[in-house]
From Swiss-Prot:
Span list, region Disordered: 1-21
Domain spans labelled CRAL-TRIO: 84-243
Record-level Gene Ontology MF annotations: non-membrane spanning protein tyrosine phosphatase activity; protein tyrosine phosphatase activity
Compartment(s) where it occurs, according to its Swiss-Prot or TrEMBL record: Cytoplasm
This protein's encoding gene: PTPN9
InterPro entries: CRAL-TRIO_dom, CRAL-TRIO_dom_sf, CRAL/TRIO_N_dom, CRAL/TRIO_N_dom_sf, Prot-tyrosine_phosphatase-like, Protein-Tyr_Phosphatase, PTP_cat, Tyr_Pase_AS
Reactions accelerated catalytically: O-phospho-L-tyrosyl-[protein] + H2O = L-tyrosyl-[protein] + phosphate
Modified sites of kind N-acetylmethionine: M1
Protein name: Tyrosine-protein phosphatase non-receptor type 9
Length: 593
């Protein structure tokens, strides 16, 4: 199929013959790509936007297009709904806006007011969504496309608590090479003395050409760079602006107006149910001896730094459902939302729930689609949702890696009956305790779920791991590895008894795994299970790849560098016990770190 070249629309901006030819060439190249990935072709006006930003250099414009697409994909900037929370509040916060005046060259003026930014109250990807949304509104204008953008970073009245280094890096990276606008200059106004250190870090990332466009100014110096007619009153200008109400003008009359880039970005997101497991052997897998050498070479600090590389990557996807006002009370922690692309959806039932939301994510296992459901420790107001999920997903095994309370803080609710023969009713589902077995490191409870609507009963095995310390990670992985085997064996036995797997009637049901937030110990447990499964089958594994891929399905999985390093240690401990490496010398260096 040949790519179609988008026709020049009647209302398109006036271009020179050379610019029109460059636009046709750009569209021809880009639409070869859109045909390949079966997405809609790019329009003429969108093409012009990217070409304007690179002065109609076709190759540089193509590079910008892919940088922009990839940045939006990584930051989850897709299907924006500016009339819905939390994006609406972020837009209307006034921390970022576009002035209604231009500089003498015709450039649009964007203003970021640092004192209005509170990192501890904001979700970074929502801040970036608002930034993208408002910048997109600015570059919809042909005049802005042609004449560029001036960016003012107003630090007057701000303090260190208003500053976020990681956000600053992302904004500058965006402006310098991932957004279709000509960046004329960046004016940093009223910077405190402490700003010199973080700015020196940020400036190292910039090319000389971009660095030359950044100027740090006192408030009294701004009028030497822009006339007063272009500046707000607090910067010595004449523009009257109420930051609390100014951005209302940028909200569309209809929510969620079509964005041609949504389709182009979404094709690269992992679909919730259609692909095979993301955990398949990759090109950079290590043998166990290579892993020993790798950990000894990098040492503990190096592995911690490796985790930071993973942590810095923002989730691939969106959190609209988690952040919807009606669902916020169903999240145990406000900063642990659930990806829309992989979330478990409940069946809406009359009198039970008005939403299909639960903070739970499908997660792949080694060469197995949806092997786990990673979820938070149930809250009292989500007990019924939890058991509905267990029933609807035909779950046979539940793994709990926390206690009800740790360190004096509530970590999970008591969502199942603790004593033999006791029962709890959750709507039309009644859960009965058939028996409890207390082991050294875990407790095993056999539960029966009775669906009174369907008049069916099922057995579920509940495991609670008890040897994870209140703080940090276990000193040895031995008990967790043994526990992992017990869980695997129980799942295999339950599936075999169910008979569905051998008859091919349905895929193996997922194991529900939870801790408190559903990302730290849950991610550690699942990562270890995946890595050991691959090691046992192929003799190779890749921890970095496993955790990175896991976070595309259960965002923020593995919360700390300590948990990440524990995965490496646990694998080496397992390998030594199984005789995969000689005990002693090779592992002594690892253990002594």
């Amino acid at each position: 199929m040949e790519p179609a070249t988008a026709p020049r629309p009647d209302m398109a901006p006036e271009l020179t013959p050379e610019e029109e030819q460059a636009t046709k060439q750009f569209l021809e190249e880009i639409n070869k790509w859109t045909v390949q990935y079966n997405v809609s072709p790019l329009s003429w006006n969108v093409a012009v936007k990217f070409l304007m930003a690179r002065k109609f250099d076709v190759l540089r414009a193509i590079e910008l297009f892919h940088s922009y697409r990839e940045t939006r994909r990584k930051e989850g900037i897709v299907k924006l709904k500016p009339h819905e929370e939390p994006l609406r509040s972020e837009i209307l916060s006034g921390k970022f806006t576009i002035l209604n005046v231009r500089d003498p060259t015709g450039a649009s003026i964007a203003l970021f007011t640092a004192r209005l930014h509170h990192p501890h109250k904001s979700v970074q990807h929502v801040v970036l969504q608002a930034l993208f949304y408002l910048l997109d509104r600015a570059v919809d204008s042909f005049e802005t496309q042609r004449n560029g953008l001036v960016f003012i970073y107003d630090m007057c009245g701000s303090n260190y608590a208003n500053f976020e280094l990681d956000l600053g890096k992302k904004v500058l990276n965006l402006l310098k090479g991932a957004f279709p606008a000509r960046l004329k200059k960046v004016l940093i106004v009223g910077a405190p003395i402490w700003f010199r250190v973080p700015y020196s870090i940020i400036s190292l990332l910039l090319k000389d050409k971009v660095r030359e466009r950044i100027q740090i100014l006192k408030t009294s110096e701004v009028t030497q760079h822009l006339p007063r007619e272009c500046l707000p009153e607090n910067l010595g200008g004449y523009v009257k602006i109420d930051l609390a109400t100014w951005n209302f003008q940028f909200l569309p009359q209809v929510n969620g107006h079509p964005d041609p880039f949504d389709e182009i970005i979404l094709f690269s997101l992992p679909p919730a149910l259609d692909w095979d497991s993301v955990h398949v052997p990759g090109p950079h897998a290590m043998t166990i001896q290579e892993l020993v050498d790798y950990v000894n070479a990098r040492q503990k600090q190096g592995i911690y730094e490796e985790y930071e590389d993973i942590r810095r990557e923002n989730p691939v996807g969106t959190f609209h459902c988690s952040m919807s006002p009606g669902n916020l009370e169903k999240n145990r922690y406000g900063d642990v939302p659930c990806l829309d692309q992989t979330r478990v959806k409940l069946t809406k039932r009359s009198g039970h729930t008005q939403t299909d939301y639960i903070n739970a994510s499908f997660m792949d296992g080694y060469k197995q689609k949806n092997a786990y459901i990673g979820t938070q420790g149930p809250l009292e107001n989500t007990y019924r949702d939890f058991w509905l999920m267990v029933w609807e997903q035909k779950v046979l095994v539940i793994v709990m890696t926390t206690r009800f309370e740790e360190g004096g803080r509530r970590k999970c609710g008591q969502y199942w009956p603790l004593e033999k023969d006791s029962r709890i009713r959750f709507g039309f589902l009644t859960v009965t305790n058939l028996g409890v077995e207390n082991m050294n490191h875990y407790k095993k409870t056999t539960l029966e779920i009775h669906n009174t609507e369907e008049r069916q009963k099922r057995q579920v095995t509940h495991f609670q791991f008890l040897s994870w310390p209140d703080y940090g990670v276990p000193s040895s992985a031995a008990s967790l590895i043994d526990f992992l085997r017990v869980v695997r064996n129980q799942q295999s036995l339950a599936v075999s008894n169910m008979g569905a797997r051998s008859k091919g009637q349905c895929p193996e049901p997922p194991i529900v795994v939870h801790c408190s937030a559903g990302i730290g110990r849950t991610g550690t447990f699942c990562s270890l299970d995946i890595c050991l499964a691959q090691l046992e089958e192929l003799g190779t594994l890749n921890v970095f790849q496993t955790v990175s891929r896991m976070r595309t399905q259960r965002a923020f999985s593995i919360q700390t560098p300590e948990q990440y390093y524990f995965c490496y240690k646990a694998i080496l401990e397992f390998a030594e016990k199984e005789g995969m490496v000689s005990s002693g010398q090779n592992l002594l260096a690892v253990e002594s770190q």
